[in-house]
Amino acid sequence: MKGFAPISLVILVIFLFSVGVWSSEEADEGVAPMEKTEQETLYSAIQGFVGKWWNGSDLYPDPCGWTPIQGVSCDLYDGVWYVTSMNIGPILDNSLNCSPSAKFRPQLFDLKHLKSLSIFNCFLSPHKHPVPIPSENWWNLAGSLESLEFRSNPGLTGQIPTTFGSLRKLQSLVLVENGLSGGLPTNIGELVRLKRLILAGNWFTGQIPDGFGGLNQLLILDLSRNSLSGPLPITIGSLTSLLKLDLSSNQLEGQLPLGFGNLKMLTLLDLRSNNFSGGLTKSLEEMHSLEVLVLSKNPIGGDIKTLEWQNMEKLVILDLSGLGLIGEIPDSISNLKKLRFLGLSDNKLTGNLLPKIATLPCLSALYLHGNNLTGELKFSESFYHKMGSRFGAWNNPNLCYVSGMVPAGHVPFGVRPCQQGEEEVTLVEKPNSKTQLGDEILNQNSHYTTSLGISSFGIDGFWWLSGFLQLLMFLLLT
């Protein structure tokens, strides 16, 4: 046994030496240096946003070590700390908040390892203190920047600088609810690594550039709530990786492109509140992954039976309201077993309403008002209990309900009871004021969310749908 003592001693020495080396490496990483130039550059860039009172060297003498700055992240390069992420704005209680005189300082563009830049709720006054996005120096970040996000900055004005086209590593460009205007730069189409392009809620004008069709890795394209006009570019059919396409609330026009049929991965298409016309395109049938289709408030026209709706079996939300559609509601819609919301209001639809539509297992909101539907509502008592106020059929003069099939308290708003042997009938619960009717319409809008179990608290205008669609896309992508 004594012969094993030297061997044990050697093993112990090796073990202790290994632990010492490991501990030394950990310690070295913990006290890794930061270049003084990088440190001063960081302080100056932040000071431009939060104000001259902010003294970074006193408050955060070791910003990548034992005195970290909220919203700033660092990584090691060759044993030295460099800033890789900066988030400015009131995200958390101790976040860096902007001053009323916030501005971009040129030192921001000297952070040569910066991968992510986010500025939220910083530039707030478009009249007293408008701030344009700097037009120069973005090429200094061309080798590092992967994510650029400006949100809720109404005082951030002017155009998107063409120098954004130099950011060839960019994967996410998000410019939402700012005061930006002008046309969309064509060279954004050269950012071929982009996966998210979200430019919603600004004042952009002009047409969508053809060059956007070159973004073949794009997953989300959201240009909603701007003033874009003209037809959709044919090249949009080249975005075959797209999961979400939201072009709602613009002034886009023309026919729905045949290229839509190439978007096999698309789960959400929102084109509401534009000027599209020319009928429903058959290419919509080829979008087999589609779960949300919102075309409402467009003068599209044509026959609702143009499409074989059973081919879109994954649909959860279908809103065709306000399109000027004609014809009878097709039986094929009754094959959409996952459908939760169906909006067919304010069209020119005719014919009897098939009872089968009420048997859709997931349906929790059905709006048919403002058409020329006829005959009896032959829905079961359980249907009315299930729907409550989420069923709308008013303003169909020749439509009536069978009294014995409707439970007390669930009489369909604005629909007359079917009566035999009487020439005069009156509408039940006819709205006695514009306010009452307006409340019902508002109630319909809120059911995009409530019919799916999502609270409508805080909904304002079209924000209710945008918020829901964003939440739904988040769930789909994760």
Residue ranges and their predicted role:
Residues 2-73, 84-91, 121:
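Surface-exposed cap/linker segments adjacent to membranes
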